[in-house]
């Protein structure tokens, strides 16, 4: 299987070079489950796209500092590509910004959250049991780092997970699109660098709590397994 990573950002954080760029982070976490997966990187932030849609079996849109409702030309071009992938029922995964821009591109709405920043390790509840993540319960923990949120899902989307602070935390569209607001790719030390960099924006209390939660266990490998099962169906 080949997954095309539609990279929407560049890592420029001080002290973060050891973690690489987002495509490398995603490759590492997917290879932890299936070392045979191939990856192709497309810098959509610089208008780089596959020549043909079927160049890859599935695509994944990364996180980004940009807003899904931005009028930047590359953001609008990415929305157009999402619509093409949807029309062709090409497998597509969205993570954080990817989750948001897929919702925006297909008729949903993304806005700055009235609840402010959502940061740290947090739990999200699974609503649709056909997407069980483990045999024990219907909650899982992921790293979060976002201020925008999906406030309205696309008309044909099915909500499968959420929480009080992130109601539209995960959704599917038919059998070819799966999106999650939580991160699967971020190392906890890298997340700490993000929170350090954004401390003033986040606020002292939320920053302190977010850093404290980074000692909690996370379920990114369980989520990666579900994503792979989804794209391989």
Q: Where is each model-derived feature located?
A:
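A short acidic, often aromatic-flanked loop/helix-cap motif at beta-alpha or helix-coil junctions
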Residues: 46-50, 118-119, 151, 167-168
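Cysteine-nucleophile active-site neighborhood
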Residues: 62-130
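Conserved beta-strand segments of alpha/beta enzyme cores
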Residues: 38-40, 109, 141, 158
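Conserved beta-strand termini and adjacent loop/short-helix elements that scaffold enzyme active sites
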Residues: 42-44, 113, 145, 162
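Short, glycine/charged-enriched secondary-structure capping and boundary segments
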Residues: 18-21, 54-56, 73-76, 107-110, ...
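Amide-donor transfer/coupling interface in amidating biosynthetic enzymes
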Residues: 2-8, 12, 87, 126-233
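N-terminal beta1-alpha1 cap of cysteine-dependent amidohydrolase-like domains
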Residues: 1-73, 77-80, 84-88, 208-233
């Amino acid at each position: 299987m080949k997954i095309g990573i539609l990279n929407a950002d560049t890592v420029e954080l001080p002290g973060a070079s050891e973690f690489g760029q987002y495509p490398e982070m995603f490759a590492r976490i997917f290879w932890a489950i299936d070392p045979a997966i191939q990856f192709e990187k497309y810098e959509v932030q610089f208008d780089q796209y596959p020549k043909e849609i079927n160049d890859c079996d599935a695509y994944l849109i990364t996180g980004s500092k940009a807003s899904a409702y931005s009028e930047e030309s590359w953001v609008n071009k990415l929305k157009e590509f999402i619509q093409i992938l949807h029309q062709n029922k090409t497998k597509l995964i969205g993570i954080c910004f990817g989750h948001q821009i897929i919702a925006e591109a297909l008729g949903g709405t993304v806005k700055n959250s009235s609840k402010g920043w959502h940061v740290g390790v947090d739990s999200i509840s699974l609503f649709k049991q056909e997407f069980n993540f483990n045999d024990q319960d219907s909650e899982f923990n992921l790293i979060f780092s976002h201020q925008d949120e999906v406030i309205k899902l696309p008309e044909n989307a099915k909500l499968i997970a959420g929480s009080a602070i992130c109601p539209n935390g995960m959704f599917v569209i038919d059998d070819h699109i799966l999106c999650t607001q939580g991160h699967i790719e971020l190392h906890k030390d890298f997340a700490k660098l993000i929170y350090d960099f954004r401390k003033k924006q986040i606020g002292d209390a939320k920053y302190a709590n977010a850093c404290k939660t980074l000692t909690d266990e996370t379920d990114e490998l369980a989520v990666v397994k579900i994503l792979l099962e989804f794209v391989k169906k």
